[in-house]
């Protein structure tokens, strides 16, 4: 039975057509056979002209499998959070808003699982993926990434008070009504936008379910743990200041 809830799924992309080219067909096929009402938006984050052209060709090809896909091009770089929020902002008819990374680290089956879970929940509930290494949900990543992940999680809990197992996993599903109420107060667009989003959702009274999913490191990722660490910490401090000021 098809879901009655209208879902918007955004895949942010920045100079990443090759990895989306590997993951996109899998996700398109999964969405086509899901029975869910999903508007899939590939949101480009100011990629090069060649990348934009490659994305256009790719989306045209994927449309043959899943017609409800579209490409949104941003002329300037707006960062990952900006690419997601710009797409969400134009979808006022949606009941559920979601995003999934373009690299394929999260498989299509997990995407459908989270979307289906959200459809069955209370309208003011959300769902996020969690990377937790078990037999059922194997996680494959270098030890350096595992260490930086644990350190960042501790910082988030101590600085922000957001007590989730994994704030940075590349799939989140949120209630559209709650997002549109708080959207103007969301300032972060870089790698810590997820933390601010989750904090604001909690402040809105939303219940967030954490679902463990399989995950594997895909080469050519955009996050550089050592180089990006200071910027991410600065972002957490900005979020903390806004939270103390009652912005959320």
Each model region followed by its residue ranges:
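Hydrophobic targeting segments
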Residues: 5-11, 27, 38-43, 233
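Short, well-formed alpha-helical segments that are part of the catalytic scaffolds
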Residues: 16-31
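Short beta-strand/loop segment that forms part of the nucleotide-sugar
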Residues: 36-46, 72-74
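A conserved acidic beta->alpha catalytic loop
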Residues: 44-55, 104
């Amino acid at each position: 039975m098809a879901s009655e809830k209208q879902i918007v799924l955004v895949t942010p992309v920045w100079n990443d057509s090759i990895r989306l080219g590997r993951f996109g067909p899998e996700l398109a096929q999964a969405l086509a056979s899901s029975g869910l009402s999903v508007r899939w938006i590939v949101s480009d984050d100011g990629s090069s002209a060649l990348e934009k052209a490659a994305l256009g060709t790719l989306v045209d090809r994927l449309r043959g499998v899943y017609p409800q896909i579209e490409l949104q091009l941003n002329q300037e770089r707006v960062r990952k959070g900006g690419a997601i929020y710009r797409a969400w902002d134009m979808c006022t008819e949606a009941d559920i808003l979601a995003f999934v990374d373009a690299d394929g680290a999260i498989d299509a089956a997990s995407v459908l699982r989270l979307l289906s879970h959200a459809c069955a929940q209370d309208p003011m509930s959300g769902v996020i993926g969690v990377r937790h290494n078990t037999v059922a949900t194997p996680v494959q990543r270098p030890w350096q990434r595992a260490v930086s992940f644990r350190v960042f999680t501790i910082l988030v809990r101590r600085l922000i008070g957001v007590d989730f197992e994994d704030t940075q996993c590349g799939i989140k599903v949120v209630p559209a009504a709650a997002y549109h109420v708080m959207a103007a107060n969301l300032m972060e667009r870089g790698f810590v936008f997820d933390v601010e989003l989750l904090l604001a959702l909690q402040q809105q009274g939303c219940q967030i379910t954490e679902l463990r999913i399989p995950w594997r490191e895909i080469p050519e990722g955009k996050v550089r743990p050592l180089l990006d660490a200071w910027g991410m910490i600065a972002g957490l401090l900005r979020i903390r200041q806004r939270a103390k000021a009652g912005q959320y």
